């Protein structure tokens, strides 16, 4: 799964570039991918000591409302909230893409994981073949939010909808992510590929999903 995260400021903000957020408060949903994406975008635009963040609600709608009330200078949103923010006049000062992921415990068999991989692969192919059709799911998923219900599929920027078929986790990417998070105090200990990635189950599952004999 590929996720688009956008660093968003209110319509009245004087900030137009991520560099201008140095020493200004950015609200992040700590513990989620959007928060890490936010730190990455800020880190690339200023010295680490200038990155200023605070914990914010996990509810994207409430976070956007707080941004519009002026409670902080910026936050990071995903779709459909990026589109809602743009409709409200907000500006995107930076965007990035990152891998969403899932965690399987030891009880998940290669067969179950293979079924999951097949289902996700089929979904990715269908959505990539007609993204405009499937962005309507963003609207369907928030039946009680008037702003989202007012959106039409044509309102979405399809360039922000990116999907990739699932595959084995590249060790160098997993190592980099771990070490980067550790450098921010978000992880402790050294990266251990054998402890973090069950290659035996992963390999068997992907072979089963692809119909390759074991």
Where in the sequence are the language-model features?
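Conserved C-terminal helix/tail region of periplasmic/extracytoplasmic solute-binding proteins
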Residues: 182-214
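Secondary-structure end/capping motifs
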Residues: 110-188
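Short, glycine-/small- and polar/acidic-enriched structural segments
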Residues: 1-57, 73-76, 94-96
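Short aromatic/hydrophobic-glycine micro-motifs
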Residues: 47, 90-91, 186
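Pocket-lining segment of extracytoplasmic ligand-binding domains
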Residues: 59-142
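Residues within well-ordered alpha helices
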Residues: 41, 84, 180-181
């Amino acid at each position: 799964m590929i996720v688009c995260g956008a660093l968003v400021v209110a319509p009245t903000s004087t900030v137009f570039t991520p560099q201008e957020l140095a020493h200004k408060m950015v609200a992040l949903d700590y513990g989620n991918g959007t928060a890490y994406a936010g730190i990455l975008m800020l880190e690339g635009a200023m010295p680490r000591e200038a990155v200023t963040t605070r914990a914010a609600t996990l509810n994207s709608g409430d976070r956007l409302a707080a941004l519009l009330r002026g409670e902080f200078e910026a936050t990071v949103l995903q779709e459909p909230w990026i589109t809602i923010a743009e409709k409200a006049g907000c500006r995107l000062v930076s965007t990035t893409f990152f891998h969403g992921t899932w965690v399987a415990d030891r009880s998940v068999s290669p067969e179950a994981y293979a079924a999951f991989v097949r289902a996700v692969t089929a979904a990715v192919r269908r959505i990539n073949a007609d993204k405009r059709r499937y962005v309507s799911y963003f609207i369907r998923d928030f039946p009680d939010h008037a702003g989202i219900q007012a959106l039409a599929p044509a309102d979405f920027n399809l360039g922000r909808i990116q999907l990739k078929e699932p595959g084995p986790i590249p060790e160098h990417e997993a190592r980099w992510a771990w070490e980067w998070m550790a450098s921010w105090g978000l992880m402790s200990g050294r990266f251990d590929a054998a402890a973090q990635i069950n290659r035996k189950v992963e390999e068997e599952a992907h072979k089963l999903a692809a119909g390759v004999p074991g």
